[in-house]
């Protein structure tokens, strides 16, 4: 007598193949593979296998990802569910400009992890700050997923969380990468501090800090080191929200090797330990002094700009007359007080105009108190450069646009939703790589010497181009001759056919 199945006939008719078994799980019909096995008794039985999909009543069998992959590899899948149209231009442009950065990553990380880090950073550079749970959608719809289709890495939330955790916990490869950047830099290094709002109550680094009232949320503090001459970032590091920059910078200086470096930093990094470390191993520093500094108060009482004057020319169109006073504190340390006469005169005129307009915040008493100190800079240095070079180095440091400034001001980098300590430091490294790629794009756009063209414009024009799958090849679509010519002037010529 044949045993009757408990599965309805209108479900059984969708059974995908032999050696499969349908199981009713409260109305959900799951399909499993099975195979016949000989039992110790000599009789035959079945051994249940893995889940291959489910049957939807009235619709049919729906294979899961694992079974689809198996069918595809065996050539048995009647149709392949895959993306046939991907974004191309902005990704290909950034990869063209930053191929050397991928090479550096491959020198420090296993090849597949280097590609995963690089893909993450390229997406961040193309779209600005993007939360970790949004990266996978960009990746799957981009030429990156075609380029790295034979790699096993994923770009989903869990996969990227593991990646960031590993980078932060097993930090030697990232440190090797950063040290290489430092060693190959111009040795003119600026260090800058930023405050970032944190929206994660569980973030190990998020605490109340000096900007908590303004941010309406806990904060983390980010310190960036970057090369003043080449305009590239060298190091990103996040610290506790309650930390102060002058202590955090000591940790950075002690954790990396710096030699024969000229540091240009702001007065938030002024501390005996930081200044000592910035003066060892052939290093020197330039730092502005706060008004509360005892030497500033002393010098102000009798200040006369008797040491000399010079013309400062930051570019071909701009110049300023600078007078200065210089004195030595010891054999290696000087204080130089600079006064930009043009800036001083400009601010005097502006303030007087505000007084004439009746602005309540302006008064003759305040004018008399402040007018002598507009455009005045008190700088302390252990550099042996002459005064004009010290001033030029200090002013040049403020002209650098870091990737953090770009995303903070233009790409909605307002808060982090990161909790894990290691993930936070892993993200620091992703930010560094993203900043490196962004600096390459900045340089390429700057070299166009077209004031009306920005990095946004270039990415937008390149972003129109797509690759569409035809047979086994990807073909370039949605191009415009004018855009192709502009991108070609940057050295980037889009591929018409991409074989993957």
Label each region the model flagged.
Residues 264-273, 291-294, 423:
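Acidic, metal-coordinating catalytic cores used for nucleic-acid/nucleotide bond scission
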Residues 418-442:
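Basic, amphipathic alpha-helical segments enriched in Lys/Arg and hydrophobic/aromatic residues
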Residues 218, 238, 282-396, 464-500:
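An anionic, glycine-rich sequence signature occurring as long contiguous blocks
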């Amino acid at each position: 007598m044949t045993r009757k199945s408990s599965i309805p006939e209108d479900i059984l008719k969708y059974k995908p193949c032999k050696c499969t078994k349908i199981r009713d799980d409260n109305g959900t019909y799951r399909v499993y593979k099975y195979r016949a096995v000989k039992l110790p008794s000599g009789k035959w039985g079945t051994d249940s296998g893995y889940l291959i999909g489910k049957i939807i009543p009235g619709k049919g069998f729906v294979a899961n990802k694992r079974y689809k992959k198996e069918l595809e590899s065996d050539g048995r899948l009647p149709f392949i569910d895959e993306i046939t149209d991907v974004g191309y231009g902005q990704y290909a442009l950034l990869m063209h400009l930053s191929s050397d950065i991928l090479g550096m990553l491959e020198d420090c990380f296993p090849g597949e992890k280097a590609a995963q880090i690089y893909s993450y950073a390229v997406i961040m550079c193309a779209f600005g700050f993007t939360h970790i749970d949004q990266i996978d959608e960009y990746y799957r719809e981009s030429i990156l997923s075609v380029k790295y289709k034979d790699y096993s890495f994923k770009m989903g939330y869990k996969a990227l969380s593991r990646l960031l955790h590993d980078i932060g916990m097993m930090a030697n490869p990232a440190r090797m990468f950063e040290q290489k950047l430092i060693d190959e830099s111009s040795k003119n290094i600026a260090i800058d501090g930023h405050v970032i709002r944190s929206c994660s109550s569980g973030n190990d680094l998020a605490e109340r800090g000096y900007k908590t009232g303004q941010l309406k949320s806990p904060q983390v503090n980010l310190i960036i080191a970057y090369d003043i001459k080449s305009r590239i970032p060298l190091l990103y590091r996040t610290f506790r929200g309650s930390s102060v920059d002058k202590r955090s910078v000591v940790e950075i200086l002690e954790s990396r090797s710096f030699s024969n470096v000229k540091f240009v930093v702001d007065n938030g990094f002024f501390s005996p330990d930081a200044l000592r470390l910035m003066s060892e191993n052939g290093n020197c520093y330039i730092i502005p002094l706060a008004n509360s500094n005892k030497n500033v108060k002393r010098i102000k009482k009798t200040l006369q700009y008797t040491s000399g004057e010079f013309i400062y020319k930051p570019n071909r169109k701009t110049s300023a007359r600078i007078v200065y006073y210089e004195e030595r504190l010891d054999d290696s340390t000087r204080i130089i007080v600079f006064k930009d006469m043009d800036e001083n005169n400009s601010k005097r005129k502006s303030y007087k105009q505000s007084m004439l307009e009746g602005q309540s915040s302006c008064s003759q008493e305040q004018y008399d108190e402040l007018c002598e100190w507009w455009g005045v800079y008190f700088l302390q240095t252990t550099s042996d450069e002459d005064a004009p070079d010290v001033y030029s180095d200090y002013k040049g440091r403020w002209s650098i646009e870091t990737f953090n400034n770009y995303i903070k001001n233009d790409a909605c980098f307002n808060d982090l939703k990161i909790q894990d300590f290691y993930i936070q430091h892993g993200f620091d490294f992703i930010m560094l790589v993203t900043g490196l790629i962004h600096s390459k794009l900045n340089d390429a756009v700057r070299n166009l010497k077209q004031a009306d063209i920005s990095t946004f414009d270039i990415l937008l024009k390149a972003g129109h181009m797509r690759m569409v799958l035809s047979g086994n090849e990807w073909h370039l679509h949605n191009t415009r001759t004018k855009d192709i010519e502009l991108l070609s002037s940057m050295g980037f010529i889009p591929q018409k056919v991409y074989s993957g």
